[in-house]
Amino acid sequence: MSSSSLLEDLMQALQCLPSVGPKSAQRMVYHLLDKNRKGALNLSSLLERAVNEIGHCQQCRTFTEQNLCAICDNDKRNKNGMICVVEMPVDVLAIEQTALFSGTYFVLMGHLSPLDGVGPEQLGLNLLDKQLSSGQHSEVILATNPTVEGEATAYYIAEMAKRYAIKVSRIAHGVPVGGELEYVDSTTLSHSFSGRSVF
């Protein structure tokens, strides 16, 4: 039995999501149509609203429904003087869930990748440079991913910050909590050794 073109289109559309292949998309579509049509309509409505109403914070570039996100609009966070640079909005969420950081963020929406046509301008580094030159920041915390591109991006931003005599730090990378050394790759292990602390 062949599927209708609308079903096929819907399954294909769902595959734009990360980790969703043909089988997962098929299960989702058949579940929503067979068991949860009300949920499907609610999902459709919320997706449409989100796409139309959620934009980027004018200061840090994370997702928000307002001109400024709740963090940038918080005077206590702004007075802290620390700014944490991350690659994606989901990284802000991950750090916020630790409840350890009380400064502001700057979201790059990617990393430097000249081969893909992603340079400083595409990452909004002119906006970051303007913020750093304002004299309101005492420390830049680099929290880009520990990839070649992430490290290159971190280095580029560190050089920017040093022009304004701002302290620059990099989040530690190493062995995960609960991890076993035999399963840790050599690059991660070398980062762990070079970033070791007194016990």
Swiss-Prot record:
Cited SMART domains: TOPRIM
Gene Ontology terms for molecular function: DNA binding; zinc ion binding
Entry annotated with the keyword DNA damage: yes
GO biological process, one term: DNA repair
Pfam family, one: RecR_C
Signal peptide per UniProt: none
Highest taxon of the lineage: Bacteria
InterPro entries reported in the protein's UniProt record: DNA_Rcmb_RecR, Rcmb_RecR, Rcmb_RecR_Znf, TOPRIM_dom, TOPRIM_RecR
Xref: Gene3D superfamilies: 3.40.1360.10, 6.10.250.240, RecR Domain 1 (1.10.8.420)
Domain Toprim: 81-176
Alphabetical UniProt keywords: DNA damage, DNA recombination, DNA repair, Metal-binding, Zinc, Zinc-finger
PROSITE patterns reported for this sequence: RECR, TOPRIM
Zinc finger C4-type: from-to: 57-72
Protein task: May play a role in DNA repair. It seems to be involved in an RecBC-independent recombinational process of DNA repair. It may act with RecF and RecO.
PANTHER family for the chain: RECOMBINATION PROTEIN RECR (PTHR30446:SF0)
Family under the similarity heading: Belongs to the RecR family.
Protein name, per record: Recombination protein RecR
Source species taxonomy: Bacteria, Pseudomonadati, Pseudomonadota, Gammaproteobacteria, Alteromonadales
